[in-house]
């Protein structure tokens, strides 16, 4: 039974002649299987159907003859010898084998593409998990820092309250030592000795109240105002930062620094004042500040 040539087999399987010839030529006429591999790998190439430039006298897809290969001529290689013709049954059988080979190659290609897709999906999920873990670590770090800041502020408040209580106790002890006995107790005049009622001793001025917070109202150049509560120990720079973050666009944007003024008594706060606590600047328990553009220099 005579076999179909590789080119005829590819055409029989439905491949265009030009594409089949190109596949055989580019694979060095190594057989139908190599040509089929090339066709499947390059079927989506935009230039797959473009003709291939070949040397003069060479026919794409034609298997080289023994004379072209330089080998000896066999008894059946006479010029003009007719090629055996396949019967219809033989042709169908050979076509069936070729189609099975095509189907096998297609299955192998689909399996390879499926494996590659699965690997890409695993890679995508792995990257997503790593990104989620990184975000979670960042969030945990931020929460931990916030908790530490709250604990620090609470400790500072407790220390400040303790200092206030200790000062009150010292003041009480000093008054008791000065006037004798308990604070507020006054010696009663003798009942048996009539006479003018002794004048009560002069009272100590009331202890100045300690404030932990202060309410600041900031008036902006456009007539609007901002109101915020700050801790008495916070620096004036905290008020300026609050204004720069919450003011509108009328001052030229957040890149332009501002200057804080007090209305009465009239005072312009300097950079050195920004480092001083609000309590020390006399802004406790409440104050009104005016915002102006900071002059350059």
Swiss-Prot record:
Among InterPro entries, the record links this protein to: UBA (IPR015940), UBA-like_sf (IPR009060), UBA_UBXN1 (IPR041923), Ubiquitin-like_domsf (IPR029071), UBX_dom (IPR001012)
Q: Any idea where the UBX domain is?
A: 209-291
Residues annotated as coiled-coil are 86-176
- Keyword set for this entry? Acetylation, Coiled coil, Cytoplasm, Phosphoprotein
| Positions of region (Interaction with BRCA1) | 43-297
Reproduce the free-text note on domains from the UniProt record: The UBA domain specifically recognizes and binds 'Lys-6'-linked polyubiquitin chains.
This protein is called UBX domain-containing protein 1
The organism named in the record is Bos taurus (Bovine)
Name the gene that codes for it: UBXN1
């Amino acid at each position: 039974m005579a076999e179909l040539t590789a080119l005829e087999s590819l055409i029989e399987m439905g491949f265009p002649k030009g594409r089949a010839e190109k596949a055989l030529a580019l694979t060095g006429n190594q057989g139908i299987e190599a040509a089929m591999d090339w066709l499947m790998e390059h079927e989506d190439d935009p230039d797959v159907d473009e003709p291939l430039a070949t040397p003069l006298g060479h026919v794409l897809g034609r298997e080289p003859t023994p004379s072209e290969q330089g080998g000896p001529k066999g008894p059946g290689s006479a010029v003009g010898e007719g090629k055996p013709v396949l019967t219809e049954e033989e042709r169908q059988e050979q076509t069936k084998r070729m189609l099975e080979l095509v189907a096998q190659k297609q299955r192998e290609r689909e399996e390879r593409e499926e494996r590659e897709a699965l690997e890409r999906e695993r890679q995508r999920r792995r990257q997503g998990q790593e990104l989620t873990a990184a975000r979670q670590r960042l969030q945990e770090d931020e929460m931990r820092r916030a908790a530490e800041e709250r604990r620090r502020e609470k400790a500072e408040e407790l220390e400040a309250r303790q200092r206030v209580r200790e000062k009150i106790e010292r003041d009480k002890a000093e008054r008791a030592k000065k006037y004798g006995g308990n604070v507020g107790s006054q010696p009663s005049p003798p009942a048996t000795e009539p006479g003018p009622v002794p004048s009560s001793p002069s009272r100590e001025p009331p202890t100045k109240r300690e404030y932990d917070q202060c309410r600041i109202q900031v008036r902006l150049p456009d007539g609007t105002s901002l109101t915020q509560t700050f801790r008495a120990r916070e620096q004036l720079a905290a008020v300026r930062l609050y204004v720069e973050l919450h003011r509108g666009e009328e001052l030229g944007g957040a890149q332009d620094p501002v200057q804080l003024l007090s209305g009465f008594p009239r005072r312009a706060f300097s950079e050195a004042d920004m480092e001083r606590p609000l309590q020390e600047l006399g802004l406790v328990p409440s104050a009104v500040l005016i915002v102006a553009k900071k002059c350059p220099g």
